[in-house]
Amino acid sequence: MQVSLVDYRTGYLVDLEGIRQVIGDRLLIVDAIQGFGVVDAPFALADVVVSGGQKWVRAGWGTGFLALSDRAVETLVPVFSGFNATDADGTPTEVLAPARSARAFSVSNPDPVAQARLAAALEEIAGVGIPAINARLAEKVSRIIDLADEFAVEVVSSRAESERAGIVVIAPEPDQLTLLTASLHNHGVTSTTREGTVRLSPHVTTDEETFAMLRGAFTSFASAVNL
């Protein structure tokens, strides 16, 4: 069973405990990129957890990890790997058995600088704690939802804190989509538009100035709609 911890289109946060109960002993593979670093998820229930470090962890591009349970190591067979995906020393020329670890899925030597960036970012997260980060982010997300409600912009992502992480999805009328995205852009607000919806995502460091920019964008949008 393969799932995204947080759906990038809808912002929905899955219930890993519920999924594990339903699928029984089947392998559970989790793409955690949209929630790792801000969601206190029970990752130990998964057999595979994979995530990049460039999003919530803020470690920059070229960072990430793959974690496998013992059962996943025994069950999964790599289709494509590099020369270092074996436990053999040196640079053998013959085809060898893959390593008995997540190393079996590596394709090249690691980047020490990227490793250092990821380690430093994770140390900062560990120092603060995921629950504290999640609580602060929930406040920021709620403020975006409240602003959208104030200006009658429909929120189609979940409002329940147990079903969301850091993505708010709003859905203007189809003929108002371009107007909304233009208003956001003109006020310096970065957003993502997909399939007729607009995604907004704060961070724990999103400040009052940024929320004022978002309010300004919504104000311009609402004024143009009412003309």
PLM features: residue spans?
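Structural signature of PLP-dependent enzymes
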Residues: 99-145
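Active-site PLP attachment segment
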Residues: 45-92
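Active-site phosphate-binding strand-loop segment of PLP-dependent enzymes
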Residues: 1-37
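Structural preference for beta-strand elements that scaffold enzyme active sites
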Residues: 27-29, 48, 167, 190, ...
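Conserved PLP-binding catalytic core of the aspartate aminotransferase-like
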Residues: 135-142, 149-187
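PLP-dependent enzyme catalytic core of the Aspartate aminotransferase-like
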Residues: 176-227
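The feature captures the short pre-catalytic strand/loop hairpin that immediately precedes
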Residues: 87-105
